[in-house]
A protein has these predicted regions:
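Bacterial N-terminal signal peptides that target proteins for export
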Residues: 1-8
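C-terminal motif of bacterial Sec signal peptides marking the signal peptidase cleavage site
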Residues: 15-19
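Bacterial signal peptide processing site
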Residues: 21-24
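Short, glycine-/small- and polar/acidic-enriched structural segments
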Residues: 27-168, 180, 226
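A ligand-binding cleft/hinge motif common to bilobed small-molecule-binding domains
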Residues: 94-108, 163, 196-214, 305, ...
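Pocket-lining segment of extracytoplasmic ligand-binding domains
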Residues: 98, 179, 184-270
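Secondary-structure end/capping motifs
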Residues: 239-311
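Conserved C-terminal helix/tail region of periplasmic/extracytoplasmic solute-binding proteins
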Residues: 307-323
């Protein structure tokens, strides 16, 4: 298992020490973290717009009224969060579906427990896109052949999505040169010409647009209609030992998703509490969708593309992985 986790983390956890939101205790179980009827749970998240409902739900008391207190810690991507959850560093984590399917294909004990975020399903109006700097001669995904394209994690959901955009545009994805960069480092790298294109998500997408960048493809839309991009998950051990905490987390997160979907202005404000997005750029952020349930058909499409890209050691069992 240790070897599997090391592989998932690609050599390092990449977990930032910055605790966003409420501060929490160590990596103890919920029993040890419980005080005065409140259970503190550590959640591994990514500092992107996707997780805004969790911060907003904490502010609105959706978790506290169920006896939960969230301690959020940021990481670069889902691939870094999976080992943290399985090892007990986090009780819950936010991860894209490809990372979860990769983990399960390696027999890592993960279980998705509640929906996370979905694409808007509208090309040109999604929260993630392939972008090129102002004045770039690149006009379509086909022209990314031989070019350097940044993704937040190699051999994962965004690389798969970019590959699909290149295929759909008539290009050869095997000729694209992928490089790994954190989302918040992409605007400067793109503007400085260190990369030719970047697959960015909000709020970094709004930042690159403010620098004059242009979208050339909505890769998440290219993968599948209304793609379920990510979900919140736990380890199978934690789910079995702490069913009450898992149920409370599911309920509070579901309430948070529904509230976020109906209150976009409050979502934008919540984003400022855990990212460095300038106030002037905030209004330009394209929000994703936060549906109550995952879209299984879209996850199956993502699974097929991941298999095509050679990401899985065995076929992921979606019946076991999904709630």
């Amino acid at each position: 298992m240790r070897r599997l986790l090391a592989g998932l983390a690609v050599g390092s956890f990449l977990v930032a020490a910055s605790a966003c939101g409420s501060s929490g205790g160590g990596g103890a179980s919920d029993k040890n973290a419980s005080s005065g009827g409140t259970t503190t749970v550590k959640v591994g998240v990514i500092p992107i717009v996707d997780v805004a409902p969790l911060y907003l739900g904490q502010q609105k008391g959706f978790f506290s009224k169920r006896g939960l207190k969230l301690s959020m810690t940021t990481a670069q991507g889902g691939a870094a969060i999976v080992p943290g959850v399985v090892s007990g560093q986090f009780q819950f984590g936010f991860s894209n579906m490809t990372s979860l399917m990769i983990a399960q294909s390696q027999n890592v004990p993960v279980k998705a427990v509640v929906n996370g975020v979905a694409s808007t399903g509208v090309a040109g109006k999604d929260f993630g896109a392939i972008t090129v700097k102002k004045g770039s001669p690149i006009k379509s995904a086909k022209e990314l052949e031989g070019k350097k394209v940044a993704v937040n994690t190699l051999k994962n959901i965004n690389e798969t999505a970019v590959r699909e955009s290149v295929r759909k545009a008539g290009g050869d994805p095997s000729k694209v040169k992928f490089v790994e960069l954190a989302f918040d480092q992409m605007p400067a790298a793109l503007d400085g010409g260190r990369i030719d294109a970047a697959m960015v998500v909000e709020p970094a997408l709004a930042t690159v647009k403010s620098q004059g960048a242009t979208e050339i493809a909505s890769s998440l839309v290219d993968v599948a209609k209304d793609l379920t991009v990510a979900m919140y998950f736990t380890s199978t051990q934690y789910e079995q030992k702490n069913p009450d905490v898992v149920k409370k987390f599911q309920e509070a997160t579901a309430e948070s998703l529904a509230y976020a979907d109906a209150h976009p202005d409050e979502v934008r404000q919540a984003v400022t509490t855990y990212t460095k997005i300038p106030a002037a750029t905030l209004a330009q952020v394209t929000l994703p969708k936060w549906p109550a349930e995952p879209n299984r058909a879209s996850i199956e499409a993502l699974e097929k593309l991941g298999a095509q890209d050679g990401l899985f050691k065995s076929t992921p069992d979606l019946d076991k992985l999904l709630p």
